[in-house]
Amino acid sequence: MLDQKLIRENPTSVEENLSLRGKVYKISHIHELTVKKKEIDIEISSLQSESKKLSKLISQVIGKSQDNNSQELNDLKKKGNEYRIKISELEEKQRILNKKVDDEIYNLPNFPSKDAPIGKDESENLQIKTWGDPLIKENIKSHWEIGESLNIFDSIKSTKISKSRFITLIGNGARLERALINFMLDMHTKNGYLELMPPALVNSESLTGSGQLPKFSNESFKCSNDDLWLSPTAEVPLTALHRNELIDPKHLPLKYVAYSPCFRREAGSYGRDTKGLIRLHQFNKVELYWFCDPSKSLEAHKEITTDAESILKKLNLPYRLVDICTGDLGFSSSRTFDLEVWLPSSKCYREISSCSNCLDFQARRSSIRSKIDKKNTYIHTLNGSGLAIGRTMAAILENGQQTDGSVKIPDALVPYFGSNLLKTA
């Protein structure tokens, strides 16, 4: 979340920074709420101070006088009771006002980085580089055509089981998925990440801390009888892991990697990517996550992106690196680098990883701090897919397809898959 002090003291600057996202943000009403909140905070603090002084005075009067029912003492006690009533009334106003302020500020996105390219939407994202040679030739099959011919996944039966946009992996398809998960986890743990396996169900406070709630409640699946949601990404439980904690600075950076199933409604994608593995309600992903010193998050952002890139390079999958423009940034991100893998059937690159620096945005929402330079400071959080499993499988199927209908397995994956070819069982 954004700093309330900044909203209170410089609302114009806040509006200008948010406008870089290509949308007009008017926060005058939030500014008024934060000013009123500060006034009440000061008034409560002043009354509490006066109440403490009065308590000391009452103790002194009692100590000096043998008459515990004197007029002076009764007047002081009456005044003390008035203080308590007034403080209680103000604290109730404070509680209501705090909720109003939080409800408003929780809906404001992060400030875009001054280094992010200015733009209105994905058409103005900036390509930084490409890697590998994209496969371009005639008669290229799509990954879902390959999957069906090799009988490695089935969407029709999955629709019968659940609904559309679900997939059942079969035989070598399930085996390939498992191989990819193990390969990615091994790569990242060798690179200094601690492997975690968090819960797939998360509460509302966790989703609020990472930025999914309250704005994106319609994009996630909620359990009707509990305050629990199916996690849309491991970013959510990994952020919540240290909620309300003061992390010892000597432990920073904390680098986590987690495989998890992810669940999304894909509410705004009707009619898009209806076939195959690209856009599903349930998919698997390996997530990278950092907690770091604020002074080191820019370098950490480069490193987490390089770590995600290393998987694509090991699998010999052509990709490009894209700097996301201000108008296309995710809600919690200040700057994002996307990795997009080449899918020859559609003759284009498709997102396979987003590596984001959220600065202190999630740490403020989750109250995660560290004592840095003798001051309790909100730390910075970073996240990135390392990688999305289904999209990686789609890229392997399309880029590795052979004329006989089989698929060449990348060399780095052979020890995990157990064969250098994927073919009909």
Swiss-Prot record:
PROSITE patterns recorded: AA_TRNA_LIGASE_II (PS50862)
MF annotations from Gene Ontology: ATP binding; serine-tRNA ligase activity
Top-rank EC class of the record's enzyme: ligase
Binding-site residues for ATP, renumbered to this chain: R264, R265, E266, E351, I352, S353, S354
Catalytic activity: tRNA(Ser) + L-serine + ATP = L-seryl-tRNA(Ser) + AMP + diphosphate + H(+); tRNA(Sec) + L-serine + ATP = L-seryl-tRNA(Sec) + AMP + diphosphate + H(+)
A cellular component annotation (GO) from this entry: cytoplasm
Keywords: Aminoacyl-tRNA synthetase, ATP-binding, Cytoplasm, Ligase, Nucleotide-binding, Protein biosynthesis
Pathway assigned in UniProt: Aminoacyl-tRNA biosynthesis; selenocysteinyl-tRNA(Sec) biosynthesis; L-seryl-tRNA(Sec) from L-serine and tRNA(Sec): step 1/1
Gene Ontology biological process terms from the UniProt entry: selenocysteine biosynthetic process; seryl-tRNA aminoacylation
Enzyme Commission designation: 6.1.1.11
Binding site for L-serine: T233, A234, E235, E287, S385
Subcellular location: Cytoplasm
Protein task: Catalyzes the attachment of serine to tRNA(Ser). Is also able to aminoacylate tRNA(Sec) with serine, to form the misacylated tRNA L-seryl-tRNA(Sec), which will be further converted into selenocysteinyl-tRNA(Sec).
Entry remark concerning the domains of this protein: Consists of two distinct domains, a catalytic core and a N-terminal extension that is involved in tRNA binding.
Quaternary structure and partners: Homodimer. The tRNA molecule binds across the dimer.
HAMAP family linked: Ser_tRNA_synth_type1
Entry's family note: Belongs to the class-II aminoacyl-tRNA synthetase family. Type-1 seryl-tRNA synthetase subfamily.
PANTHER family in the record: SERINE--TRNA LIGASE, SERYL-TRNA SYNTHETASE
Protein name from the UniProt record: Serine--tRNA ligase
Organism, scientific name: Prochlorococcus marinus (strain AS9601)
Organism taxonomic ancestry: Bacteria, Bacillati, Cyanobacteriota, Cyanophyceae, Synechococcales
Gene name as annotated: serS
